[in-house]
């Protein structure tokens, strides 16, 4: 490679001198255009002036034989030098590859399938969170450091803050706004519904209550004894039994006493169509008022159900009875005595 570089230096120097002597450029000499132009001039001199030798024609043009030889042989020399450089470079690259391959032979041969599982990774896999797992918070610290340039901390700080503000405006504010609108709409709807229930006029309707009262009366008037027993008593006495009455055979002398219907007590009830009177807050404070039976509904709409109201609706919590230590010790004593008696019995049976 050193010899090729030396030849290249000599060729460049010769071509440069020829270009300075003739006025042609180096590119024209390397391409062969200068040699073709000189040959045309020599041919014209031979035709016009009758010059027969090349040396006389070269001298007539004003060139030396060395310069003419350099100009005429420069294209071929450059082509041969290029081929030489390509050959030397290819051989050197092949030699370099072979040297690296054979020098690193032990490292390039895979031994994974010999002593380990086949298909195992040749390099260790370190995830992005590897150092953050070993040192929690290091990635956040490094990222924050990279955001600010110590040399130009002012513009970098302004760019970072403006970028964070833009992300907040673009991503966070729409989500927060939609959530707040949803909360306000839900709150407004609940408040409007609660105020509507407070201000509306309520009327008593006994139709559903009467239906449940009829069902309650029907099941309360049923006989505590089976109908087959009533038929047996009626057949024995020869009387007719009308079902649907209340029967009682306790201390009864005849079936007439059994089939007597119980007199229902006349209960005072509120008639349908009556309006519930609205109460006004005392003292003229114009506070919001509601009947007691409406409080669970209103407080449930506002989401402020108190523990006392929950106990009123669901009933008191049933707590488990705690067993005292004395009773547990007594129970243990009885168990121990039972075990000892069983042991004594087994001993007596063995003996």
Swiss-Prot record:
<dbReference type="GO" id="GO:0019062">
    <property type="term" value="P:virion attachment to host cell"/>
</dbReference>
<keyword id="KW-0472">Membrane</keyword>
<keyword id="KW-0407">Ion channel</keyword>
<keyword id="KW-0167">Capsid protein</keyword>
<dbReference type="GO" id="GO:0140267">
    <property type="term" value="P:symbiont entry into host cell via permeabilization of host membrane"/>
</dbReference>
<keyword id="KW-1160">Virus entry into host cell</keyword>
<keyword id="KW-1163">Viral penetration into host nucleus</keyword>
<dbReference type="InterPro" id="IPR001070">
    <property type="entry name" value="Polyoma_coat_VP2"/>
</dbReference>
<dbReference type="GO" id="GO:0042025">
    <property type="term" value="C:host cell nucleus"/>
</dbReference>
<keyword id="KW-1182">Viral ion channel</keyword>
<keyword id="KW-0946">Virion</keyword>
<dbReference type="GO" id="GO:0015267">
    <property type="term" value="F:channel activity"/>
</dbReference>
<keyword id="KW-0406">Ion transport</keyword>
<dbReference type="GO" id="GO:0044167">
    <property type="term" value="C:host cell endoplasmic reticulum membrane"/>
</dbReference>
<dbReference type="Pfam" id="PF00761">
    <property type="entry name" value="Polyoma_coat2"/>
</dbReference>
<feature type="transmembrane region" description="Helical">
    <location>
        <begin position="289"/>
        <end position="309"/>
    </location>
</feature>
<keyword id="KW-0449">Lipoprotein</keyword>
<keyword id="KW-1048">Host nucleus</keyword>
<keyword id="KW-0238">DNA-binding</keyword>
<keyword id="KW-0519">Myristate</keyword>
<feature type="compositionally biased region" description="Basic residues">
    <location>
        <begin position="341"/>
        <end position="351"/>
    </location>
</feature>
<comment type="similarity">
    <text>Belongs to the polyomaviruses capsid protein VP2 family.</text>
</comment>
<dbReference type="GO" id="GO:0075732">
    <property type="term" value="P:viral penetration into host nucleus"/>
</dbReference>
<keyword id="KW-1162">Viral penetration into host cytoplasm</keyword>
<feature type="region of interest" description="D1">
    <location>
        <begin position="272"/>
        <end position="307"/>
    </location>
</feature>
<feature type="lipid moiety-binding region" description="N-myristoyl glycine; by host">
    <location>
        <position position="2"/>
    </location>
</feature>
<feature type="region of interest" description="Disordered">
    <location>
        <begin position="312"/>
        <end position="351"/>
    </location>
</feature>
<dbReference type="GO" id="GO:0003677">
    <property type="term" value="F:DNA binding"/>
</dbReference>
<dbReference type="GO" id="GO:0034220">
    <property type="term" value="P:monoatomic ion transmembrane transport"/>
</dbReference>
<keyword id="KW-1161">Viral attachment to host cell</keyword>
<dbReference type="GO" id="GO:0019028">
    <property type="term" value="C:viral capsid"/>
</dbReference>
<keyword id="KW-1133">Transmembrane helix</keyword>
<feature type="region of interest" description="DNA-binding">
    <location>
        <begin position="312"/>
        <end position="351"/>
    </location>
</feature>
<keyword id="KW-0945">Host-virus interaction</keyword>
<keyword id="KW-1188">Viral release from host cell</keyword>
<protein>
    <recommendedName>
        <fullName>Minor capsid protein VP2</fullName>
    </recommendedName>
</protein>
<keyword id="KW-0812">Transmembrane</keyword>
<dbReference type="GO" id="GO:0005198">
    <property type="term" value="F:structural molecule activity"/>
</dbReference>
<feature type="short sequence motif" description="Nuclear localization signal">
    <location>
        <begin position="315"/>
        <end position="323"/>
    </location>
</feature>
<keyword id="KW-0426">Late protein</keyword>
<dbReference type="GO" id="GO:0016020">
    <property type="term" value="C:membrane"/>
</dbReference>
<keyword id="KW-1038">Host endoplasmic reticulum</keyword>
């Amino acid at each position: 490679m050193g010899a090729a570089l030396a030849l290249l230096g000599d060729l460049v120097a010769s071509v440069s001198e020829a270009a300075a002597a003739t006025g042609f450029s180096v590119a024209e000499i390397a391409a062969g255009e200068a040699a073709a132009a000189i040959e045309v001039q020599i041919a014209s001199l031979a035709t016009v002036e009758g010059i027969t030798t090349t040396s006389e024609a070269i001298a007539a043009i004003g060139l030396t034989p060395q310069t003419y030889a350099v100009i005429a042989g420069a294209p071929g020399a450059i082509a041969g030098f290029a081929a030489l450089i390509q050959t030397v470079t290819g051989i050197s690259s092949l030699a370099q590859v072979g040297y690296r391959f054979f020098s690193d032979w032990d490292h390039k041969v895979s031994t994974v399938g010999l002593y380990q599982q086949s298909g195992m990774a040749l390099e260790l896999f370190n995830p992005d969170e590897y150092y953050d797992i070993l040192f929690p918070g290091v990635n956040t610290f490094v990222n924050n450091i990279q955001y600010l340039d110590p040399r130009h901390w002012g513009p970098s700080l302004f760019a970072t803050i403006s970028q964070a503000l833009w992300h907040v405006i673009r991503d966070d504010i729409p989500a927060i706004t939609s959530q707040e609108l949803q909360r306000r709409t839900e709150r407004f709807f609940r408040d409007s519904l609660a105020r509507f229930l407070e201000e509306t006029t309520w009327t008593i309707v006994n139709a559903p209550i009467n239906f449940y009262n009829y069902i309650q009366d029907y099941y309360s008037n049923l006989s505590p004894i089976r109908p087959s027993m009533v038929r047996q008593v009626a057949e024995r006495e020869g009387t007719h039994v009308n079902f649907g009455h209340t029967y009682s055979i306790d201390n009864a002398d005849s079936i007439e006493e059994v089939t007597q219907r119980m007199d229902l007590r006349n209960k005072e009830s509120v008639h349908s169509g009556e309006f519930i009177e609205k109460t006004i807050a005392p003292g003229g404070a114009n506070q919001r008022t509601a009947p007691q039976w409406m409080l669970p509904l209103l407080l449930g709409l506002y989401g402020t159900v108190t523990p006392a109201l929950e106990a009123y609706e669901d009933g008191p919590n049933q707590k488990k009875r705690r067993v005292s230590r004395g009773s547990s010790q007594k129970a243990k004593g009885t168990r121990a005595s039972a075990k000892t008696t069983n042991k004594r019995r087994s001993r007596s049976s063995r003996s």
